[in-house]
Amino acid sequence: FAFAVWQVRAEVDGTRELATLHEALLDSRSWFGDHDERLAHEYAAHFGMPSDRLLAYWRSLRYELDDRMQQGALHYYALAASLDEAAPLGALPWANVAGV
């Protein structure tokens, strides 16, 4: 199940701004991985749970759209298309962030 996906309009595909955003998201994910224990201790009370439970939850999250998640997204689009809520989609379109 893909809970959230960063999406952009087609006209920003391949732009320097998109590449910059992509790099910032990767840097943020890396920074969080280096500081997750401290953050769990700092914010456990805010979330009303022990820090080890919060840390375990955070570490259970995945940030890559693997094949299974991509198939789930396509299934979601197919269901939406069957209700005339979205156009049929045969494949997930990917933005060009490396070719800038």
What is each residue range found by the language model?
Residues 1-17:
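A bilobed periplasmic-binding-protein/Venus flytrap-type ligand-binding module shared by bacterial periplasmic
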Residues 3-5, 62, 91:
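Generic secondary-structure boundary/loop-capping signal
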Residues 9-11, 64, 68, 95-97:
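Surface-exposed loop/turn and secondary-structure junction residues enriched for glycine/proline
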Residues 81-100:
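Long, low-complexity C-terminal extensions of enzymes
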Residues 3, 9, 25, 57, ...:
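Aromatic-enriched hydrophobic runs in primary sequence
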Residues 14-79:
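Secondary-structure end/capping motifs
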